[in-house]
Regions:
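Short, glycine-/aromatic-enriched active-site segment of Class I SAM-dependent methyltransferases
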Residues: 11-32
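Short amphipathic alpha-helical segments, especially helix-boundary/capping motifs
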Residues: 2, 15-20, 87-92
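Short, conserved beta-strand edge motifs with alternating hydrophobic and charged residues
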Residues: 10-13, 54-56
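Short alpha-helix
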Residues: 33-55
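Glycine-rich loops and low-complexity Gly/Arg-rich segments
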Residues: 6, 33-38, 77-82
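Short gly/pro-enriched beta-turn/loop segments at secondary-structure junctions
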Residues: 9, 38-39, 109
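A short glycine-rich, Lys/Arg-flanked "PGG" loop and its adjoining helix->strand segment in the class I
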Residues: 1-8
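Conserved Class I S-adenosyl-L-methionine
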Residues: 54-124
Length: 124
């Protein structure tokens, strides 16, 4: 278990807002079973014997901020390190990722933070 009895666990996890298109799954390099929906994330904690205390999801604006900063950092790195042997691969990957986010990701995948309590008496 991740924490002692009487302790808390804070988990950040993606969740499906809707059924993921197969083209988006290909961009992610994954499958539908990698994530639950928001309720499923809470239920997974309950199934692990934890008590949900709070949950919050990122807004579209917050998700955009994260994705654009991620893409921008890779673009900047490649621009500043053009001789890096992985530069072309990195640039290709981030541009496919960004296109996938704009086509499908923003409406399909969300991000939540989940606070759980582990029942029991703390021993330390």
């Amino acid at each position: 278990m991740w924490t002692q009895p009487g302790g808390y666990v804070l988990i950040g996890e993606g969740y499906w807002k809707r059924k993921a298109p197969s083209d988006y799954l290909a961009v992610l390099g994954g499958n539908e079973q990698e994530y639950f929906d928001h309720r499923g994330n809470v239920q997974a904690g309950i199934d692990a014997g934890l008590v949900p205390m709070h949950a919050v999801v990122a807004s579209d604006d917050e998700w955009d901020e994260y994705e654009w900063k991620y893409a921008r950092s890779i673009e900047r790195f490649v621009r500043e390190q053009p001789d890096d042997p992985d530069a072309v691969t990195m640039l290709d990957r981030i541009r496919r990722w960004r296109d996938g986010y704009l086509r499908w990701g923003r409406d399909t995948l969300g991000f939540g933070a989940y606070l759980f309590y582990r029942p029991g008496i703390r021993t330390t």
